A protein has these predicted regions:
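Bacterial signal peptide processing site
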Residues: 27-30
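Extracytoplasmic
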Residues: 42, 73, 83, 93, ...
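Segments of small-molecule ligand-sensing domains
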Residues: 262-334
Length: 334
């Protein structure tokens, strides 16, 4: 796995466009227009992303721009959401056409467990970049391990987010009850950052690409008043319970200007659609992700870790047939 070696500034025009897209996104849209889009006849496509200071939102806006500019008859918009769980629920309800999700949450969805009471009819367009578990604690909190979070005020992520799924699993792996043993604050990233600045929480748990602008803001503002927490001691317990979806990774020191690299736990992201999504359109969107990857990299450096060699590795989530056909040719491209 390649890791970024420096913090990359967001391209201002691309980010501005992404912000505009998300600000004007309509989750529902006109059902006839959306139905036509899903069947490959042109129309509006709504992409479910995440909070405004997260990477899903930025790269989702970039993808919406690529679709609108390169696929005749389509206009795509990026919707701000609570992220993974909400995104999958929205796919099922028909509120969104395309969705970003962590693979562990998507695995729960197809297996009908965790936040999902029955298997969800979803398919993948491609695997994306990895999310890094980024846990920041106040330097004066006394927290040096997850077990030290007992009785502390912890942001476990927004309701129905992939971050919340990982946060609860990590706390459980450390021997803590995520509901009873910590004062869990179910905050989205922007609110978590504000709460850390205001000293109303002791730590935040976040799962996102590198760099995440909200995390950059926090460490830039508070400097040595916050520090990252190494949680890799919980990896064996996570793997024993949830399989191989979790892996060890590293947050390079240069990304957030830290004194040393931070060992952490990573999980892949996937781009999802509802089963039955037009295969020709699915193939075109999958092609765009790789043919125009450099444009996504300008929006956020996390896109540099979108790996063509891993594009089809979305198990246990099945690939959309059209996307699967498109991805077969990736390694043959110049």
């Amino acid at each position: 796995m390649k890791h970024p070696t420096r913090t990359t500034r967001l391209a201002v025009p691309a980010l501005a466009f992404a912000l505009a897209l998300a600000a004007t996104a309509c989750a529902g849209g006109k059902q006839d227009e959306k139905g036509a889009a899903n069947s490959g006849k042109g129309g509006r496509l709504t992409i479910a992303t995440g909070p405004t200071t997260g990477v899903y939102y930025q790269i989702g806006g970039g993808l919406a721009e690529l679709i609108s500019d390169n696929l005749d008859g389509y206009r795509a918009t990026a919707a701000t959401t609570g992220a993974s769980v909400q995104n999958i629920q929205g796919l099922q309800a028909g509120s969104y056409d395309i969705a970003f999700s962590l693979l562990d949450t998507a695995q729960d969805a197809v297996e009908g467990k965790g936040s999902f009471d029955k298997p969800q009819s979803i398919e993948a367009l491609t695997r994306l970049y990895p999310n890094y578990t980024q846990i920041l604690v106040r330097a004066d909190s006394g927290i040096t391990s997850l077990r030290d979070m007992r009785g502390k005020r912890i942001s476990t992520g927004a309701p129905n987010s992939g971050t919340e799924v990982i946060a609860r699993r990590l706390l459980s792996a450390a021997g803590l009850d995520p509901v009873k043993d910590v004062s869990a604050q179910r905050l989205a990233l922007p609110e978590s950052v504000d709460a850390m600045k205001d000293n109303t929480i002791d730590a935040l748990i976040w799962s996102g690409g590198l760099p995440t602008s909200g995390v950059t803001d926090l460490v830039t503002s508070l400097k040595d008043k916050v520090r990252f927490l190494d949680v890799t001691a919980q990896l064996p317990a996570l793997s024993n319970t949830h399989g191989g979806v979790y892996q060890k990774g590293t947050i390079p020191a240069a990304v957030y200007h830290q004194p040393a690299d931070v060992p952490t736990i990573v999980v892949p992201n996937v781009l999802l659609v509802k089963k039955g999504f037009d295969p020709r359109l699915a193939g075109k969107i999958a092609d765009l992700v790789y043919d125009k990857k450099n444009a996504l990299e300008k929006v956020n450096a996390a896109a540099t870790e979108i790996d063509p060699a891993q594009a089809g590795n979305t198990a246990p989530v099945p690939l959309n047939p059209g996307a699967a056909n498109a991805l077969k040719t990736l390694t043959q491209r110049p």
